[in-house]
């Protein structure tokens, strides 16, 4: 009898655990281009290798390193993303949590100049960005990353460079942080 009571108690306690799977949050990452030297190009295609997130370890000091997520779109053309246009590179459910940084790993950049219709070299200077953000359970976090192609050709031997100009961070539709501020 005691065993039956114990088994039924364990069964009842296991039922709420089934709902834990739905406690995921949604993370969306978009790219846009800040209009500077992008007008020099007819095409600037980025091949995105992976997206990395750095979980905030807090008291769980063993939880260090980068969490890798695969981009949903691996190739984008920056010349199509001027103004308010964006390209979604990831949208998906992930376990809720706090993060300290993100990194967009770009595998290749292929560019074609408008004037000469020749390929041009663009140096990739995109690297890790320190940014504290959270993905809440059953909530939505949107990160819009503003990339910029800058022309340094008036300072030889430099040429064009790709970098992060800023970002906008939204949680559940509300703007949380914007760099640079307007």
How should these model regions be labeled?
Residues 1-5:
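Sec-dependent N-terminal signal peptides
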Residues 7-182:
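A short, solvent-exposed, low-complexity linear motif enriched for acidic/polar residues
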């Amino acid at each position: 009898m005691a065993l039956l009571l114990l088994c039924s108690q364990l069964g009842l306690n296991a039922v709420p655990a089934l709902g834990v799977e739905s406690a995921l949050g949604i993370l969306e990452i978009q790219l846009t281009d800040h209009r500077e030297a992008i007008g020099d190009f007819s095409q600037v295609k980025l091949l995105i290798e992976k997206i990395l997130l750095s979980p905030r370890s807090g008291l769980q000091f063993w939880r260090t390193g980068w969490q890798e997520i695969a981009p949903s779109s691996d190739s984008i053309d920056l010349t199509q993303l001027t103004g308010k246009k964006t390209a979604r590179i990831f949208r998906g459910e992930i376990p809720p949590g706090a993060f300290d940084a993100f990194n967009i790993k770009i595998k290749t950049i292929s560019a074609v100049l408008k004037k000469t219709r020749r390929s041009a070299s663009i140096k990739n200077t995109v690297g890790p960005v320190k940014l504290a953000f959270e993905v809440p359970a059953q909530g939505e976090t949107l990160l819009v990353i503003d990339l910029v192609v800058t022309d340094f050709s008036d300072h030889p031997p430099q040429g064009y460079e790709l970098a992060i100009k800023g970002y906008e961070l939204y949680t559940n539709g509300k703007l949380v942080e914007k760099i640079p501020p307007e």
